[in-house]
């Protein structure tokens, strides 16, 4: 009997059943895809780090060093399993050509290395240790995508009369420098080629790397190393930070997918409740008869839940199958940069997620039927099952209406009479608006020039970076003179960054990167407090303030070479660069050499940024000159491009889901209101009049749904994104998108939904359909 009932009910409500199944399928597909992507990301990162034998602690150093000092230190540390020093030749973009195309200026450093012997291997696209022959080079995947390179093409390195030509053998994966947030990329050369280039290009940087017996001791070892006088003129990273940086871009996609899943399952549950209530209203007398006949309440519930269990299982199975077929499209970035690491869990976990989705839907179905036990058989036969959903008498009298047309008045009265019913579809439209706008707002925020404030920098037109080297001071002075003579420059400021240590409340030492200069020239936005105004003051990034447990107004101790000095914390700002641990001050507390210098330039109105950039590129070599829009793009461009894809699919899903839910809702209204519409027809109302009444109700419903969804995006949305950005140093993200984004997209959704509603009503209440339905 149960099977016959389910089959008959599915056939009778075919369109509603199909709509619910599609909604459940999309939810299952995205939830399973997010789970699959999480498993693949975790497995691929682990495989990449294991295959490369990634170091547990790395100290970058720009300057000279004494290898014996490091050897002695390492031999005395019981934590250390192995160590190595990796020399890297830095070559400026002006000396590099990819085929016939010169390398473009940007934030990325081009570092040429030999393959390491013991650990920290550079890998091929099969995650195997990469080897190149003489005359060959392996190029980072980042540059493969940027310049659309192919195997066999040529990379040229030129300096004066010296020219080196290499054939591209492979594209490499680098466990340390894969992410775009890391502003250095390593190229692999044969030992002989590296030695030859080393004779021409003298500037080198070093990676001082350590493998530990216990990777969990990386933070403790970092503290020990940084308390010594060993080389540390550069950032330091630990294995957990490498893992986080590799997971950042795809982790953001996973977070967005999970948010979309939550929204879709909320929509599916609301739609399910709507469909179940409509079905119960239609069958209430049959339910009463079953109760009179003594059929147990549990059996009656099973009949109804059985139908939705079939839909849930069908939708979740279809969603899981779609995940197996199309799920990898979300993991393209993972496969390119880290490899395709499949395991049994790659298929099992998404299956379990689909099963859990089905269980949630079935459990919710039982919850909707709870009131069955409170209704007697007599009440059911008399229509008591859904009395709470019957129209309430609203004190609106037609004879008192003087201003509104009759059809608009009747539409509003119907809306107020069935507030619960219309509230459900309003919530669905609000969720669809939220689903559409969140990824779009995030994408526009990542594209905004103002996003530079989350990278620890003030707004400007141009940025010039000078790394530590033989002529850092001379180069800075030369560029400063150029700026002073340039009439097209409105404002400029030079900032110097050094590495020093700070004491936490537990008296442990932690490294921070202190930037000093005229902070008021290009001010930051502070979450708390203000920028430093005196030499005795300092401001901290969010992660530094949390790590050091410092608040605005508190004192902190800075340490270098055994010397200590006190500073007062005046402000806390957001920064996701250099591991998120930076600080700002007016002047350096200790006399020490700079790691790098940054010059920010604001041009006068009307001055062409591209032309001015070209002038500085030509005259300021070897400095890196970057348009700030390019700086943001090169730093987080890969993340923004993936968010753009997710935003497109989210908007598509929002429009499709809203359309599907409207179709289901109107189809249910047509069946529910057949008697009402017949009565209206008999007293002289035309089909056009009835359609106008429905359109009035839906204009209000869709407008409120779109409005509340937009308000939620602009109030709740930033908090959701800030929760994800807190671990990176951006704990208070705000939408930076143009104001039209919050208007154009919701209005488009509203117009499309209204047009769809009008078309569906015209179809549903066409003469032939209406005659068949009403008679």
Where in this protein do the model-derived segments appear?
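N-terminal Sec/SRP start-transfer signal
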Residues: 1-29, 305, 391-433, 669-674, ...
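Interfacial "coupling" helices/loops that link adjacent transmembrane helices in transporter permeases
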Residues: 5, 11-13, 270-309, 660-700
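Alpha-helical transmembrane segments
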Residues: 12, 16-18, 26-54, 421-423, ...
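Peri-transmembrane interface segments
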Residues: 37, 41-48, 107, 115, ...
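Membrane-proximal extracellular/periplasmic loop immediately following the first transmembrane helix
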Residues: 46-97, 220, 455-516, 609-611
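A short beta-strand structural signal in non-transmembrane regions
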Residues: 55-62, 143-145, 176-188, 193-238, ...
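Short beta-strand boundary microenvironments
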Residues: 94-147, 452-458, 474-572
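Short helix-loop junctions at transmembrane helix boundaries
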Residues: 317-352, 370, 692, 698, ...
